[in-house]
Every structure is written in structure tokens, then in C-alpha cells.
Amino acid sequence: MFAAALLSAATASAQCTGDGVQLYPAPGGIVPTNMRLLLEGVGTAKSPVLGLVGKPLKLVSTDHEVKLKVTKGWESTLGRATVILKLAEPMQPDKRYFLNLQEVLPNVSLLNGQVGAQPSWLSGKGPDAKAPKWVKRPAVSEGFVRRSPQGIARFVKLNLALREESPAFLVVKLSPRRLGLSPQQYLLPVQGNTAYLGHEACGGAFALEDGRSYRARIEAFDAAGNLAPSTPPVDFEAPSAQGP
């Protein structure tokens, strides 16, 4: 369906992320007062993150606290897991809220935040109650393969567009077209109208086998958890690492 391309070492989607956690929406941004936080554990941080389910967490500003309920989200077979942090009440507008991760995950690195600083977000003017709308439904545009000393990274690039002001995310249920194999389901952040489905050489979100046919059922939502309308599944073949 598409040609596989060898990625350069500088290609971000093929790099090994390393052990630690990632927060979505990414720390530092402006978020709706009813945002829903996603906390991903990568590598050795996967189990500690899953261990937070049911434990009390909170967002703290100078004069307001919001309790967070931690529920299980999605788990990858390649060393990743994401939990959902739901706000017990909305944040107050125009305030900076902090999450003390070191209190519950000591000595765990934050991979998408400022080094040495508590992750924080600035609350916006109000809640986000409007669901995202599709401008361009997801489609696979190309496949990428990169060989390195650690192994093979393999991705497909999803092109899409949503009418949505806050950060958007996909939950993909990926099923091999061959019967008898279990589906995979995991989270993908949308970055600049694209999302990368696949795996790095040392782990990742989805295991793609060389040249295998897949069907991806895609669900999109925004930072507040509002769901976009359903969209047809996407069929594709995983890129092959075999040269011509």
C-alpha cells in the first residue's frame, strides 16, 4: 500500500523514549478547567504507574486543591501503560495547578516536562464541553522502518485533522487481519495533525510485524475526554524491513 522508508537517527518517532513517565496534556500549557490528565509509564515506570490506580492524588494551586481519581486506562505489550486522572471538581479559571509526582513516584523521571520542576498547567477561562469534529478522517500515508544496534523501529504515519482547540488523542484498537491473534489497544497523542502508530527498537505503543495486514479502529477525544464522532476503520500493511 505504501513504500517503507529508512528513518535517519534524528527522527523523533523512532528514538527510544527511555524509562520514566509522560503526562498528557503536556505540562506547561493552557488547559480547560475540566481537563482529564493521562499519565503514561514507560519501561521500568510502567508498574509503578499502574500501582497508582485507586490511590489519592491532587492538583494544587495557591489557594485551591482538586482531588484526582486514578483509574486504569490502557496497557501496551511493549512496556507501556497509561492511567487516567479524573478531576473530582473543575479547576478554578486562570490559576496554575501543580502535580507533585515525586510524592507518589519518587525518583521517576518526567520525560516531557521541565527537568527538576513540578509539572503544572494553567487553567483556562472555563470547561470544554464541545466534542471534536473530524475535518479529515484518519488515513495511513506512509510507513517507516529504521535499523539500529538496539533493533528495528517500525511505524506508520496517520494523517488526520480535528476541529478542536485543546490537545487531542487517539485510542486505537489494532487487530491483525489473520484470525487467531489478539488485538492491541493503546493511546496515541495527536501532534500537528499526525499520529505515529508502531514501536521503537526498544519498546513502544504497538507491536507491528513485518509486512502484516492490520485493521485499526480509531477513537478520538480531547483534553476533557469529549469524544469525536465515530470513524470507519483504517486498513494497512506494516512496513517491511526487507530491502529490495
Question: What residue ranges belong to the model's regions?
Answer:
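Aromatic sugar-binding surface patches on proteins
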Residues: S76-L85, V190-G203
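Solvent-exposed beta-strand/loop surfaces of large extracellular or lumenal domains
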Residues: T62-L78
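Extracytoplasmic/surface-exposed domains of secreted proteins
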Residues: T33-K55, R80-V108, V156-L158, D210-D222
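N-terminal non-catalytic regions of secreted/periplasmic and cell-surface proteins
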Residues: S13-K58, Q114-S166, R217, A238-P244
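Extended low-complexity, serine/threonine- and proline-enriched intrinsically disordered segments
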Residues: K46-K67, N159-L187
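Beta-strand-rich interaction surfaces with strong enrichment in secreted/lumenal proteins
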Residues: K72-W74, L87-E89, G204-F206
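A structural signal for beta-strand boundary/capping segments at domain termini and interdomain linkers
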Residues: L227-P229
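N-terminal signal peptide c-region/cleavage motif recognized by signal peptidases
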Residues: A9-T11
